[in-house]
């Protein structure tokens, strides 16, 4: 009990350190093992300079996925081509890439642009070329065109990335998603800031600024709302905020701890931690009616609830076995079972969207790392190699995890692929950033 109590206290204290508002992704591992792909600069078919380089967005997305490695443009056998009609299969025989993305951009009325792109299967194109002349339909994996405004260039670049990623992997892309996190800057009168940004840290927006700590933001399943803990009234309270209307609703303000909110899969309830009856326990609260139901009842601390995708069970962190471990409770029967056994501590768990794995913080030999456990085989893989990792949040397609860690004495955000190959940092230049949460598909 003392160990988990100290961990809970540390979580509060860690919300009192300074931060910055812009995030930059620094890839630290995994690019060399990625699959080679060619992305051509989209050909601008208008006067002057192109409004934006949409291909740069696509290349950056594919690199950050940890799955693909765009080739250097200077080494590509063809230049300044934007359509499949200009593609020459024989020229690409020695490139070694599995696919090619190319496209065009041209003016289409006032502040409107027609963006076209093609996705070519290079392996199939070369194999077919060996047999003689072939039709583009035999190796063209996708071809689309869309009219967008100048303000939509980056967003549509993410959309192209989603299409390319899904066509080549069979997994839905998550490049149009967003992240939320907490920033702290003690040079300001209201140092705590709840932020939302695109998954890559661009288009950052501040939702709330407070003189008191903010923590544990989490997304609703429809991506319209955030739940979080605020100490703005000198005590822990849970709020739900609509991202579009900015309307805030206080959901929980009981005496003692009100913490660790997690939306139910239907978005109608929150699993939360309350200490109003003594020890911290897991409860479910109806957001509309505020009706609560107690889920756990134990003398040890129970905290950090997270839902199974089917909404029938919760996992949570408890010290009921002597040290912090992750347990599962079936909501219909109340049956509790221990889920983790390896290492000294295991805590802060969440189930991947496919329901097959659990992502959590594992402590072994005093080091806190992000780990993944296969729920069928119980095989556990430590994904990170740093020391003070916390607050993992899984991308909605289950391929990446964003989490908090410490780098050069500062708390930053970082990302790791769920197979552990790809790693990146999202450092803040002037302080610290923490408590990340990845949105659902938007």
From Swiss-Prot:
Alphabetical list of Gene3D superfamilies matching this protein: TolB, C-terminal domain, TolB, N-terminal domain
Entry keywords, A to Z: Cell cycle, Cell division, Periplasm, Signal
GO biological process: one example: protein import
Main location group: periplasm
Entry GO terms, CC: periplasmic space
A Pfam family this chain is assigned to: TolB_N
Subcellular localization: Periplasm
The keyword Signal appears for this protein: yes
Leader sequence segment: 1-21
Assembly information from the UniProt record: The Tol-Pal system is composed of five core proteins: the inner membrane proteins TolA, TolQ and TolR, the periplasmic protein TolB and the outer membrane protein Pal. They form a network linking the inner and outer membranes and the peptidoglycan layer.
Stated name of the protein: Tol-Pal system protein TolB
Native organism: Shewanella baltica (strain OS195)
